[in-house]
Amino acid sequence: MEIRMSMQTGKQSICFETPPYIVSSASIVGKKEGEGPLGACFDLIGEDDKFGQDTWEEAESTLQKEAFGMAVGKAGLKKEEIRYLFSGDLLGQNIATSFGLMDYQVPLFGLYGACSTCGEALSLGAMCVAAGYADYVVAMTSSHFASAEKQFRFPLEYANQRPMSATWTVTGSGAYVLGKRKSNACITVSYTHLRAHETLANLV
């Protein structure tokens, strides 16, 4: 008889018995982000913040679509091998996510955690893989400066003056492929603290 120890730790943590691995990752950002100190770290930097689309929302959808394809490609997988998608954005009803990933026809768990969406996606995706519900999942998120301004502040067409101290929402998307295939990074612990979802990735 196989004896399994509980992976539950305390009231809000999970220590994975068999840690899932971050098999690959991909990041796509806008021109402003590419000009910053982390510019060399991104896989793709767009020259046009609309990424060839007509609207800001379509541009953000394109970010997710391309980031997903790039991450899956870097993992050497086909989209059919991805069991689930955990993703979200900052827009109402997650429209950037829904329309951006629709063509892939992968079951989607839509998340809305604001700045914690990526960590939440990694936590839930890691739990899914560790529990044996999937061989591979993708955890991802996106945001776009212009679509976020339109959603939460002032549309750019309003020409509102921004103080120098104002925050700037990232134009970009990040995607991770999680699976049991070993790599140089695994997720050992998943925990929630209040409303913030965080994931610890340890180098092995």
Model feature map: region roles:
Residues 22, 56-116:
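Conserved beta-ketoacyl condensing-enzyme motif
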Residues 47-52, 98-112, 153-161:
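Glycine/charged-rich beta-loop-alpha catalytic/anionic-binding loops adjacent to active sites
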